[in-house]
A protein has these predicted regions:
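N-terminal secretory/targeting leader peptides
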Residues: 1-153
Length: 153
């Protein structure tokens, strides 16, 4: 028997039956701070397309991302509600302890640094991501984060 489980989010976790195998459901899922989907295109093939077809692919990829993220949020909200009601007393929902989160943050930073230094592209992507994260982090804190903290959701 498992002691605890967390995979992607309660919707997918419940499809796997994790709520039946473990009495504890821990959050946040440290291995995935946000859900995003992406499309990869062969650059040469993409650039060979007419501009209107490139725009079609760009918009289709963006639409699928927005739809998928919205669908993921809605289904996880419903599944979390089910965990709290249908499985009350069988599954306890707990936040990982702060010392554990601090250790995970430190360990993850080391792995990310190591992986980001393996190729020029990895360095470029990591630098871009880190720069953007530093830009939007303060905004997230005063916007969405503050709102959710105040409202209590």
């Amino acid at each position: 028997m498992n002691d605890a489980a967390e995979w992607v989010g309660p919707h997918d976790d419940m499809k796997l039956g994790l709520h039946k195998t473990a009495p504890y459901y821990y959050y946040p899922g440290w291995h995935e701070p946000g859900t995003t989907l992406e499309f990869g295109f062969n650059k040469k093939a993409y650039e060979a397309l007419p501009a209107d077809l490139q725009r079609t692919l760009d918009h289709a990829a963006a639409a699928v991302q927005v739809y998928s993220l919205s669908d993921f949020h809605a289904k996880n909200a419903i599944a979390l509600g089910r965990l709290k009601t249908e499985f009350k007393g069988k599954v306890e929902i707990l936040q990982l302890p702060v010392p554990v989160l601090r250790d995970l943050k430190k360990l993850a930073a080391g792995v990310i640094k190591e992986e980001s230094e393996k190729t020029p592209m990895a360095r470029k992507v990591h630098a871009s991501f880190t720069k953007f994260q530093a830009l939007v982090g303060p905004w997230d804190h005063v916007a969405e984060g503050a709102y959710h903290h105040f409202v209590g959701v």
